[in-house]
Amino acid sequence: LGDVYKRQALSIVQQLCGHIGRRVEYVIDGEVLTVDCLMCAVCNGRAYGGGFMAGPEAQPDDGWLDVFIVRKVSRRVIAKLLMLYKNGQHFQNGQLTEAAKPYFIYRRAKSVSLRAADDRGPIIATADGECAPCEQVRVEVQPLAGRVLLPQPAYQRFTAKKAAVK
């Protein structure tokens, strides 16, 4: 197992040993949701944390964020959800799978902000493996804000796919 995967697995174990879940207020493209949840993943790519397929259909170049909120569940249910989530089996063909619907909320958005809606202090946000306590987190799409370098074979597949869509 890689180091990133080990750190992600350790983080999950640490979370399971403590208080599970938070009440969080989300504003997703203006829609306000207050949810008792375990976690939220805001994705513009398919995987993170050594292979967790959080956003199995998320694309970095489509101008959208795929937002997955995992509702608060018992420890007993977490193992089942973890395998769905890790393998990307919670989302197929643009929607949550039947197995995931009771436990996940999905939205497609241009902007997402969230903040704790309980009295347990700041939210712990993770980006690229770095964790930090945050009073509020905001993520939004910034078209053409970055450059991505691809190896030649990947670039050829990318341009061929774009040409086929037109």
Predicted region positions:
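Short, small-residue-biased leader/transition segments that mark boundaries at the very start
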Residues: 1-5
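A transmembrane-helix-recognition feature enriched in membrane-embedded lipid enzymes
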Residues: 6-19, 80-85
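Glycine-rich, charged/polar anion/phosphate-binding loops
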Residues: 9-13, 21-29, 50-55, 96-100, ...
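Glycine-rich, aromatic-lined ligand/substrate-binding cores of catalytic
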Residues: 11, 38, 59
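Active-site-proximal catalytic alpha-helix in oxidoreductases
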Residues: 14-17, 38-45
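ATP/nucleoside-binding phosphotransfer catalytic cores, i.e., glycine-rich phosphate-binding loops
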Residues: 28-29, 34, 59, 69-166
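Glycine-rich phosphate/pyrophosphate-binding beta-alpha loops
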Residues: 41-56, 131
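Interdomain hinge/lid region at the active-site interface
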Residues: 62-65
